C-alpha cells in the first residue's frame, strides 16, 4: 500500500521534500573527524583558493590517505542521520579518489584509463563499511548520499536550488564543470515534490477530474525538470567531462579498470564489485516510468536487468517508495488501464504529454552521452558499468512503445487532439533512434554523425 511518506531521517520521500534531503546536508564533518575533513578539503585537483590539491600530483593522495586515523569505533557510535550521511559521503570520496587516482593520471598521460588500485586500506575500508551498513548501502560512491543530492550547500542561504547557487561539499576536480554537472542534478530535483504529489494523487484518484488534475501536475513537473536539465550544456562543458569522470567509475562492469574487484582490507577477504555513481540512480524517471506505465514496456533483456540492478543503489526509503508505487500501479490499477476503462480522453492526452516529457528527458540524456562520453573517449562503458551505445536506447524504445499503446486509445479530434500531426512527430522520434543505432553498430563510428542527426530531425536538445 502506498504511504504518504518514506523517510530514513535524511531523506523523506513525500510531497513536501520530493527526493531532496529534509534539510541542507552537513558541509563539514564533526570535530572528531578533523583529519578526514582536512583530507577532503585538500583532495581536489584544484582547490577553492586556486592552489593545486593532492589529486593533482601522482601518488600524493594515496600517501595522505594512509595517515588518516581509523575512526571505526567513533563511526559505530553515530546515531544522527545527517552525520552518518556526511561520513558516508566523505569515505565514498576518499575510497574512489584513492582507488582511481592511478587511472586518472594514466588518462592524463596517455588518453586511456589505466588500472585502479585494487585494495581499499583498512583505515578507510572498515569505517566506510560500517557507515554503509548503518544506511543500508553498498560501500562505494553513490548518487544520493555521496556525489549529488547529499553533497550540496547553498552559496546564498536565502537563495533557491538553481545550480548557480549550489556548491559541492566534497569534490574531485574542484573545477566549475564538475560543480555545474552534478549540482544541476540537485537543481532538477527541486521540482520532485510536485512529481511525488502528482504520482501519489494518480494512485488515489477517485474520478476523472482528480485523475486529470494529478496527471497535469506530473506533466508540469517533468516539463520544468526538462527545462532545467537542458541547462547542462552551459553548466558543464562537454569537453571537460573527463576532468572528473574517471573518479565516479564503478567496479562492476569496468573490469578493464578494476579487474575482478576491489578488496576492502579488514572487512572482506574476497573482492567486491559495486556499480559506480550514475545519473541513472536518480529517482525522477523511475517514478515517471512507473506512474505512466512505461515500466510495463521495458524489454526483457540484459539491458533492462542492468536497470533493475541500479534500483538497489538507492536509499532504502526510496526503494520502498518505488516498490509500493509499482505495486499500486499494476494491472487494472495501472494508469493506462484506468484511463482506458473510463474512456478518459482528456486523461489519455495528458498521459501522452507525460510520455513526451519522459522521451525528451531520456533522449536529452542520450544526447549528453553522445557528446560528453562518446565524443570524449572510446571507452565503451558508462560510470555505472553499462554499455553506452545501447543502454539509453533500450529505455527510449520502451517509451516509444508506451506512446504507441496510448495513441491507439485516443480519439482523433477529442479535446482538439490531432492524431495525424502527433504521428508525424512520433515517426521522427522512431526514425532518429533507428538511424542512430545503425551508425553505432559500425566499428570505429564517428560520434558526431550520431549527434548531428538530432538537429537534422528537429530533436536537438541543446
Predicted segment positions?
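Surface-exposed peri-terminal alpha-helical interaction modules
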Residues: 1-462
Amino acid at each position: 500500500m502506498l504511504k504518504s511518506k518514506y523517510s530514513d531521517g535524511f531523506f523523506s520521500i513525500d510531497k513536501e521534500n520530493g527526493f531532496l534531503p529534509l534539510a541542507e546536508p552537513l558541509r563539514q564533518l564533526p570535530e572528531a573527524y578533523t583529519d578526514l575533513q582536512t583530507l577532503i578539503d585538500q583532495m581536489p585537483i584544484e582547490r577553492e583558493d586556486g592552489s593545486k590539491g593532492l589529486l593533482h600530483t601522482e601518488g600524493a593522495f594515496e600517501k595522505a590517505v594512509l595517515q588518516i586515523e581509523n575512526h571505526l569505533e567513533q563511526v559505530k557510535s553515530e546515531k544522527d542521520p545527517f552525520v552518518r550521511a556526511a561520513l558516508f559521503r566523505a569515505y565514498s570520496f576518499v575510497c574512489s579518489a584513492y582507488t582511481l587516482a592511478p587511472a586518472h593520471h594514466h588518462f592524463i598521460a596517455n588518453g586511456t584509463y589505466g588500472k585502479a588500485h585494487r585494495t581499499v586500506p583498512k583505515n578507510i575500508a572498515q569505517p566506510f563499511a560500517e557507515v554503509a551498513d548503518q544506511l543500508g548501502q553498498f560501500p562505494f560512491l553513490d548518487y544520493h548520499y555521496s556525489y549529488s543530492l547529499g553533497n550540496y550547500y547553498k552559496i546564498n542561504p536565502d537563495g533557491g536550488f538553481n545550480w548557480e547557487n549550489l556548491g559541492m561539499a566534497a569534490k574531485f576536480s574542484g573545477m566549475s564543470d564538475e560543480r555545474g554537472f552534478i549540482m544541476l542534478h540537485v537543481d532538477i530535483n527541486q521540482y520532485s515534490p510536485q512529481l511525488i504529489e502528482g504520482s501519489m494523487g494518480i494512485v488515489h484518484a477517485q474520478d476523472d477530474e482528480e485523475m486529470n488534475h494529478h496527471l497535469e501536475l506530473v506533466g508540469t513537473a517533468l516539463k520544468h525538470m526538462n527545462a532545467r536539465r537542458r541547462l547542462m550544456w552551459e553548466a558543464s562543458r562537454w569537453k571537460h567531462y573527463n576532468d572528473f569522470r574517471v573518479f565516479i567509475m564503478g567496479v562492476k562492469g569496468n573490469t578493464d579498470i578494476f579487474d575482478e574487484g576491489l578488496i576492502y582490507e579488514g572487512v572482506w577477504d574476497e573482492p567486491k564489485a559495486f556499480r559506480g555513481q550514475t545519473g541513472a540512480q536518480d529517482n525522477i524517471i523511475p517514478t515517471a516510468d512507473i506512474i505512466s506505465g512505461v515500466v510495463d514496456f521495458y524489454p526483457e533483456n540484459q539491458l533492462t536487468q542492468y536497470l533493475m540492478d541500479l534500483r538497489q543503489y538507492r536509499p532504502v526509503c526510496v526503494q520502498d517508495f518505488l516498490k509500493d508505487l509499482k505495486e499500486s500501479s499494476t494491472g487494472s490499477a495501472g494508469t493506462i488501464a484506468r484511463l482506458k476503462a473510463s474512456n478518459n480522453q482528456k486523461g489519455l492526452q495528458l498521459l501522452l504529454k507525460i510520455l513526451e516529457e519522459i522521451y525528451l528527458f531520456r533522449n536529452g540524456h542520450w544526447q549528453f552521452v553522445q557528446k560528453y562520453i562518446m565524443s570524449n573517449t572510446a571507452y565503451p562503458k558508462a560510470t555505472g558499468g553499462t554499455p553506452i551505445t545501447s543502454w539509453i536506447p533500450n529505455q527510449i524504445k520502451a517509451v516509444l512503445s508506451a506512446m504507441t499503446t496510448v495513441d491507439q486509445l485516443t480519439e482523433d479530434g477529442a479535446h482538439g487532439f490531432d492524431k495525424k500531426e502527433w504521428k508525424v512527430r512520433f515517426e521522427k522520434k522512431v526514425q532518429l533512434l533507428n538511424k542512430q543505432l545503425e551508425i553505432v553498430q559500425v566499428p570505429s563510428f564517428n560520434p558526431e554523425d550520431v549527434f548531428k542527426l538530432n538537429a537534422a530531425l528537429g530533436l536537438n536538445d541543446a
